[in-house]
Design a protein with these regions (language model features):
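Helix-biased detector of long, well-ordered alpha-helical tracts
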Residues: 1-167
Length: 167
């Protein structure tokens, strides 16, 4: 069962009374009255990144991937919350310095503000990122039509090439 089937079969009915949730199938929460746009993503070691040898690259990947949900909706990400889970050895002082430096670089590059988060201890590394932006409207996934233009920035498939070469 893929992500969309799982949502439809088990969780979509729980959001029926919340039009801002977009039936849980549009990657963001959008409250038009408050102009609030929110996305949440989780990244797990062994699934979204093979290991934690290069914490700085993992952080760059997860920040950029997380803000892309808002950017794809035509919204500038402004704030983010990050929660991390990992062992003491994986969250060593050396790795924490790399994580902090990488977060700082990404914040400057994309004009983001860290606004909170959480940490916990576990043997595998996992991060959850919540991104927040504000807009009067968004580009909705279900509004795409035949013959609409699609624009791509960067290199297509660069993520998989990087993944295969660096990890």
């Amino acid at each position: 069962m893929d992500e969309f089937e799982l949502i439809k079969n088990y969780f979509q009915k729980n959001s029926n009374n919340n039009p801002s949730a977009k039936n849980l199938n549009d990657d963001v929460f959008f409250n038009k009255n408050r102009r609030l746009v929110v996305s949440v993503d989780t990244y797990n070691e062994g699934v979204h990144f093979p290991d934690f040898k290069y914490p700085n690259l993992v952080i760059k990947k997860i920040i950029r991937s997380s803000i892309s949900d808002l950017i794809a909706k035509g919204v500038k990400p402004e704030y983010y919350f990050i929660s991390g889970c990992g062992s003491k050895s994986k969250f060593s002082k050396k790795n924490l310095k790399m994580i902090s430096k990488s977060l700082n670089q990404e914040q400057k590059k994309y004009d983001l503000k860290l606004s909170g988060g959480d940490t916990t201890n576990f043997n595998k590394v996992s991060f959850s990122i919540t991104c927040i932006g504000f807009s009067k409207k968004i580009v909705e996934r279900n509004k795409a039509r035949l013959n609409d233009d699609i624009y791509v920035t960067g290199n297509i498939n660069f993520c998989i090439i990087s993944f295969n070469n660096f990890f």
